[in-house]
Amino acid sequence: MSLLTEVETPIRNEWGCRCNDSSDPLVVAASIIGILHLILWILDRLFFKCIYRFFEHGLKRGPSTEGVPESMREEYRKEQQSAVDADDSHFVSIEL
């Protein structure tokens, strides 16, 4: 039930809750979305360093070298370094 659909009214000297149309599919969907949003926000605040560090560094990695022999990796590094050395007028940073 959403707080927007609940109305508190005094009933027989007690405070009760009179909920109108709480079975409406739109109200149910809005409640589910609200709860999911709250959960995701809490997780984001708890783990934001891990999450954003993964996206920041994970996307900068370049091609995967898994299963590639070390000699080919070294050859690739030399090619990348020669590409940097060829253009002395501009500084180019390549992270491997």
Curated annotation (Swiss-Prot):
The record marks 37 as: Essential for channel activity, possibly by being protonated during channel activation, and by forming the channel gate and the selective filter. This is Matrix protein 2. GO terms for biological process: protein complex oligomerization; symbiont genome entry into host cell via pore formation in plasma membrane; symbiont-mediated suppression of host autophagy. The M2 protein from most influenza A strains is inhibited by amantadine and rimantadine, resulting in viral uncoating incapacity. Emergence of amantadine-resistant variants is usually rapid. One of its GO terms (cellular component) is membrane. One of its GO terms (molecular function) is monoatomic ion channel activity. Residues 60-96 are annotated as: Disordered. Forms a proton-selective ion channel that is necessary for the efficient release of the viral genome during virus entry. After attaching to the cell surface, the virion enters the cell by endocytosis. Acidification of the endosome triggers M2 ion channel activity. Residues 44-96 are intravirion. Signal peptide: none annotated. The record marks 41 as: Seems to be involved in pH gating. InterPro entries: Flu_M2. The modification Phosphoserine is found at residues 64, 82, 93. Belongs to the influenza viruses matrix protein M2 family. It comes from Influenza A virus (strain A/Memphis/101/1972 H3N2). Keywords: Disulfide bond, Glycoprotein, Host cell membrane, Host membrane, Host-virus interaction, Hydrogen ion transport, Inhibition of host autophagy by virus, Ion channel, Ion transport, Lipoprotein, Membrane, Palmitate, Phosphoprotein, Signal-anchor, Transmembrane, Transmembrane helix, Transport, Viral ion channel, Virion. Residues 71-80 have a biased composition (Basic and acidic residues). A lipid is attached at residue 50 (S-palmitoyl cysteine). It holds the Pfam family Flu_M2. The gene is M. Glycans are attached at residue 20. The chain crosses the membrane at residues 23-43. It is a single-pass type III membrane protein. Residues 1-22 are virion surface. Homotetramer; composed of two disulfide-linked dimers held together by non-covalent interactions. May interact with matrix protein 1.
